[in-house]
């Protein structure tokens, strides 16, 4: 059935409510809009669902959420784990509560017990709740840091980690097998409650979550020493972080926490934010203004579902606030935690440090410094969470720290997804520790570069929307795969890894070997002089990303080299 036939079927089928059909009929003369909404089904991929909110098969709406949930329910029933139940949470976005509720009622209609939070909660707390309640699965309704027109739906399994192979493919196949909306079950909330299938998660879960985070604190006594002097500015970006972040900082003894008022309360429109992403410097405009007013030591911001953290800190020399990349904040937390654990005799002899392949090579040197096994995984924090399960099952390593360049890390094993709440705690404690030594977080970052080398990373993302964009992205990847460049500007390619083919080619010898990682549409070019470039289409947005890294003799040299490598990449791919 073509997109126009599918569109007409939605307009005429009384399964869809009157408002939906009326809105669809209003676009009858706009064929391009109809095509974009109906040319494909919104893909339920390895990361779940992510798309623009609206009516149509290629949009996030209650019908698509129900259909995906029916597929998940069918899988759970085949696994025979429906009695363990499913935990559900959501963020502050438009339709988030409605989507969470629809998922809950679909599961209940299939005889699967549901535990749903009474209101918005962060992604890491959902991961924690799945483990705490011994559920078979979890659902988080969120589009993370995407623009306000987006929403999404992520699936977690019983270890609190987002689904990975082979279950991801098995669940995807079950979702695809639901082709008729009439096969999708639902039930009203009252009946679900009477049957004991619809349960509200109590506030004791919040208490347990905060208690688990506080176990990761290493220097509570030092916090008390500087509590009167250290000043923290925080923005939850109108999302889920506001309550848990303020609570944990208060309970740890921080007294001067200033919250950005315009970004404090839940706001699905993100009125003061063009893009609610801690990677975007413009998102810190309000926080920087407040920081200058109160003379803050550090500025922190969590994205709407509170799994990513952005950081600014004062530079003692200039007095200016400096921004940290996700690689920098990850390395700052790592060096603080590992040095303090070593000093206190808490480092494991068989400890492991986990990072994604597109994250900084500085991590390799920090892991070596603390005698940790460095493990690299594909892009996506679920692969870091999965490693913790492997460690436990095989009794191989003890998880010490894991991070990815996209502003996410996990301290502890209470959750199996990135956790900005515990990252806030770790960074504020680090700020207190270094303040007691007379330096700022930025000063300490420079100390880390002085110790290990001046690594610098960046990325270039190109958005290509709609059906045409998907074709362009695929062609760009095919060209790089079939005709891999031998040089990137002044850098020579030393090794070429095609993770889709599971093939690593050593350029000097022509030797080919497996990559050792699961199949993924990712191309990695290892260059000479510690430089590298990686290309991958985004799994959640209509864009292709190019990641790059260099090592310089100092900050300025690293900046210059990164600019040169970025220009070389742009020239190669025609951007």
Question: Predicted regions span which residues?
Answer:
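An N-terminal, well-structured beta->alpha segment
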Residues: 5-103, 191-228, 232, 240
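Gly/Ser/Thr-enriched, mixed-charge loops and adjacent short helices
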Residues: 11, 33-38, 42, 151-285, ...
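Conserved phosphate/anionic-ligand binding catalytic regions in large, soluble enzymes, centered on
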Residues: 38-58, 143-146, 232, 236-248, ...
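N-terminal small/polar loop signature for handling phosphorylated ligands or for N-terminal nucleophile
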Residues: 87-150, 255-310
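Short Gly/Thr/Asp-enriched flexible loops that form oxyanion-binding sites at enzyme active sites
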Residues: 99-107, 150-157, 307-327, 363
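Glycine-rich phosphate-binding loop plus the immediately following alpha-helix
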Residues: 156-186, 327-350, 355-364, 420
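Phosphate-binding and adjacent anionic-ligand microenvironments
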Residues: 292, 296-298, 320-322, 340-536, ...
């Amino acid at each position: 059935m073509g997109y126009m036939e599918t569109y007409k079927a939605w307009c005429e089928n009384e399964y869809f409510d009157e408002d939906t059909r009326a809105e669809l009929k209003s676009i009858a003369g706009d064929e391009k809009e109809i095509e974009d909404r109906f040319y494909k089904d919104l893909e339920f991929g390895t990361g779940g669902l992510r798309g623009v909110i609206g009516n149509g098969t290629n949009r996030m709406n209650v019908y698509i959420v129900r259909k995906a949930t029916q597929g998940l329910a069918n899988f759970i029933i085949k696994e025979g784990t429906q009695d363990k139940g499913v935990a559900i949470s959501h963020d502050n976005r438009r339709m988030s509560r409605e989507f969470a509720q629809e998922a809950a009622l679909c599961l209940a209609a299939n005889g699967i017990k549901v535990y749903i939070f009474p209101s918005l909660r962060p992604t890491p707390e959902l991961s924690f709740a799945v483990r705490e309640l011994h559920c078979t699965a979890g659902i988080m309704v969120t589009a993370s840091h995407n623009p306000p027109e987006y929403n999404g739906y992520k699936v977690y399994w019983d270890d609190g980690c987002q689904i990975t192979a082979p279950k991801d493919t098995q669940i995807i196949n079950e979702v695809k097998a639901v082709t008729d909306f009439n096969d999708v079950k639902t039930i009203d909330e009252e009946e679900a409650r009477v049957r004991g299938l619809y349960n509200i998660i109590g506030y004791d879960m919040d208490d347990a979550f905060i208690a688990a985070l506080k176990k990761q604190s290493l220097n509570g006594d030092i916090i008390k020493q500087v509590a009167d002097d250290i000043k923290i500015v925080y923005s939850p970006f109108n999302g889920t972080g506001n309550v848990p972040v303020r609570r944990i900082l208060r309970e740890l003894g921080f007294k001067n926490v200033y919250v950005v008022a315009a970004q404090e309360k839940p706001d699905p429109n993100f009125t003061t934010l063009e893009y609610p992403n801690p990677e975007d410097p413009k998102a810190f405009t309000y926080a920087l203004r407040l920081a200058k007013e109160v003379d803050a030591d550090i500025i922190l911001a969590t994205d709407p579902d509170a799994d990513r953290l952005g950081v600014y800190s004062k530079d003692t020399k200039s007095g200016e606030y400096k921004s940290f990349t996700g690689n920098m904040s990850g390395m700052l937390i790592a060096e603080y935690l590992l040095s303090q654990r070593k000093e206190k005799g808490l480092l494991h002899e068989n400890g492991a440090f986990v990072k994604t392949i597109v994250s900084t090579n500085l991590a390799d040197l920090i892991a070596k410094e603390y005698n940790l096994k460095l493990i690299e995984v594909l892009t996506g924090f679920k692969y870091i969470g999965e490693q913790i399960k492997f460690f436990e099952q095989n009794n191989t390593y003890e998880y010490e720290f894991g991070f990815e360049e996209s502003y996410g890390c996990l301290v502890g094993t209470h959750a199996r997804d990135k956790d900005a709440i515990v990252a806030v705690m770790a960074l504020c404690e680090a700020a207190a520790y270094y303040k007691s030594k007379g330096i700022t977080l930025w000063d300490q970052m420079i100390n880390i570069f002085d110790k290990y080398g001046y690594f610098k990373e960046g990325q270039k993302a190109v958005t290509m929307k709609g059906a045409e964009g998907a074709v362009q992205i695929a062609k760009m990847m095919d060209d790089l795969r079939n005709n891999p460049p031998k040089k990137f500007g002044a850098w020579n390619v030393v090794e070429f890894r095609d993770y889709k083919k599971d093939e690593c080619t050593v350029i000097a010898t022509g030797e080919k070997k497996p990559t050792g990682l699961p199949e993924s549409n990712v191309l990695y070019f290892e260059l000479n002089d510690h430089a590298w470039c990686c290309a991958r289409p985004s799994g959640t947005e209509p864009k292709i990303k190019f990641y790059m890294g260099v090592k310089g003799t100092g900050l300025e040299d690293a900046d210059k080299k990164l600019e040169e490598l970025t220009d070389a990449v742009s020239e190669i791919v025609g951007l």
